[in-house]
Amino acid sequence: MLKGKVVGLSEDGTATIKAQVPLAQFLHREVKEVYVDMIDSRPLSDKQRRMCYALVKAIADWSGSGSEEVKEAFKLDFWAERVDTLSDKIFSLSNAPMSLVAEFQRFLVAFILTHDVPTKRPLREYVDDIEAYTYLCLVRRKCAVCGRRAELHHIDAVGMGNDRTEVQHEGREVMSLCREHHTELHTVGKAEFMTKYHLDGGVPCDRTIMKIYGLRR
């Protein structure tokens, strides 16, 4: 593996990377592909660390295992799924980069949503990336507010003047809500609802979501 560093960055975002290639490889044109991994040097925050440990503890309490055992098992599973893009060492929650910990956080949240693991506070309060959380809830068909079984909710009410069988779903703003919170949103309005539950709104409906909910287009 060759390692290099960014030596220049233009206003249009073009980066110049300098790496030392062994002369024999260069002369025989043996370097055919280049994989660039932009290393995130931002350290994780104390808030991120606390959130991860809280998620781990919730899983540990639910499974009857120890928190340390659960943490190491999930770190190993997370690493195994990303072995092609991560280093050869298991990361540590004491000094891992911010972006990696955020991805691990989403990994834990996905497990909790899939297996209905109870948490002391609403799950959305344990995440930094609300948009990613909203998408995970859609994929797992869980209410973004309470975690109960949910259905697809169009933020811009399809039922008002639109034929649901003819509407273009792809790209529309959606989120998953249980019947109770679906009704509440329509009662109090989008702005008040999102503020109350600290949500940023829906996410664009893509083909993955369309397939899950049986939408034709």
What is each model feature region?
Residues 25-81:
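The feature represents the first ordered module of a protein
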Residues 121-133, 156-164:
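Short Cys/His-rich Zn2+-coordinating modules
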Residues 173-180, 204-217:
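Short Fe-S-cluster ligation motifs
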